[in-house]
Amino acid sequence: MNQLIQAQKKLLPDLLLVMQKRFEILQYIRLTEPIGRRSLSASLGISERVLRGEVQFLKEQNLVDIKTNGMTLTEEGYELLSVLEDTMKDVLGLTLLEKTLKERLNLKDAIIVSGDSDQSPWVKKEMGRAAVACMKKRFSGKNIVAVTGGTTIEAVAEMMTPDSKNRELLFVPARGGLGEDVKNQANTICAHMAEKASGTYRLLFVPGQLSQGAYSSIIEEPSVKEVLNTIKSASMLVHGIGEAKTMAQRRNTPLEDLKKIDDNDAVTEAFGYYFNADGEVVHKVHSVGMQLDDIDAIPDIIAVAGGSSKAEAIEAYFKKPRNTVLVTDEGAAKKLLRDE
C-alpha cells in the first residue's frame, strides 16, 4: 500500500490532493451535519464556487444528501469514510507519525487525526470522535469510566454515541470541581457523556481547591466515600492535558499557588497536578477524587490533547511512564517531534 501511495504521489499528485480535499469535506459534514454550504466553505477555507462543484460531485456519487436544512452524509458516505480512514492515514503520513510518536513518548498507543485544533476548531471534534472509537474498542461487559473536565473532554462527550453492544457503562467524574466554568467541570461532562452513551452516572458534589483540613474532613463523609470508592474502581480513565499557566489562570488559582506554579517552572497539568518539563509534580490542587497514585491500577487510560501550542505540555506529561493511549492531532505531533 505504501509503495502504491508513493508512486501515486509522483505520477498523479493532483489525484491525491483531490482525494484528500473530498475526504475532508465528507469528514467535516459527518462532524457537523446538517450544515449549509456557506458554513462549510468558511470552515474549510474553500471558495463557495469550488465547494459547489465538489458537493455536486459527492451528491452524484450518492455520498451526500442536500436538503433545505443543510447537507448530510448518506449511508454510502458513512461507509466510504470508514473504509477510507486507514488509507488516508497512510496518504497523509499519519500512520508513520503515530508509530514515531508512540516510540518517542513510550505510549501504549498513539492515535493522530489530521489538522491542528489551534487552527481549525473542528479538529477537536475529530479528536473527540477518535477518542470515542478508542474507548469503545476497550469497553468490556461492565465498565466504570472516570472522566476529567476541560474543553477537549467535553468534545469527547459531544461525539459519544450509544454502545451498539449494550455493555454496562457507568460514568463518574475523576475529580471534584477544580475551579473551571460549570460547563467544563468533570461532573457536567460526566453526565453529558453518560446521556449520549445511554449509560448511567454518579456525581461528586464537593467544592474545588479545598484546604488540607477541609479535604481530610470531606473524604470521610459517607456519601462522598461511596462515590470515591466507585471512582477508584474505574476500569477506564479519560483525561485531558493542559498548559500549566493557562489552566491555573482559567481556574482562578490563588496568587500564592500561581507563584509556586511559576517559580517551579510548571509546563503541564492533568487532573489537578502540575508538572515541570521533566514530568515531576511541582504542585497539586487539593481536590477530592482520583489521585496520581490511583491511575497505576486502571487498565485503560486515554489522554486526549491536541493543538501545536500543547506540544510542550504533552511531552512533559509523558516524561514519566504512563501506560496511556494518546489521542492527539497532527499539529501537536509534528511540533513535538520537530522540537525533539
UniProtKB/Swiss-Prot annotation:
Beta-D-fructose 1,6-bisphosphate binds at G149, G150, T151, T152, R175, Q185, R250, R251, E269, K310. Residues 37-56 bind DNA. Stability and function are regulated by the effector molecule fructose-1,6-bisphosphate (FBP). In the presence of glucose, binding of FBP to the low-affinity sugar-binding site of CggR disrupts dimer/dimer bridging interactions and triggers a tetramer to dimer transition, which leaves two physically independent dimers on the target DNA and allows transcription of the downstream coding sequences by the RNA polymerase. In addition, FBP and several other phosphorylated compounds can bind to a high-affinity binding-site and protect CggR against aggregation and proteolysis. Signal peptide: none annotated. Keywords: DNA-binding, Repressor, Transcription, Transcription regulation. InterPro entries: CggR_N, NagB/RpiA_transferase-like, SorC_transcr_regulators, Sugar-bd_dom_put, WH-like_DNA-bd_sf, WH_DNA-bd_sf. It comes from the Bacteria. GO terms for biological process: regulation of DNA-templated transcription initiation. One of its GO terms (molecular function) is cis-regulatory region sequence-specific DNA binding. Contains an N-terminal DNA-binding domain and a large C-terminal effector-binding domain. Contains two distinct sugar-binding sites with different affinities. Homotetramer. Binds primarily as a dimer to each half-site of the full-length operator, with much higher affinity for the right site. Then, both dimers interact, bridging the two-half sites of the operator region. In the absence of glucose, represses the transcription of the gapA operon, which encodes five key glycolytic enzymes. Binds specifically to the cggR-gapA promoter region and blocks the progression of the RNA polymerase, leading to the arrest of the transcription. Belongs to the SorC transcriptional regulatory family. This is Central glycolytic genes regulator. The gene is cggR.
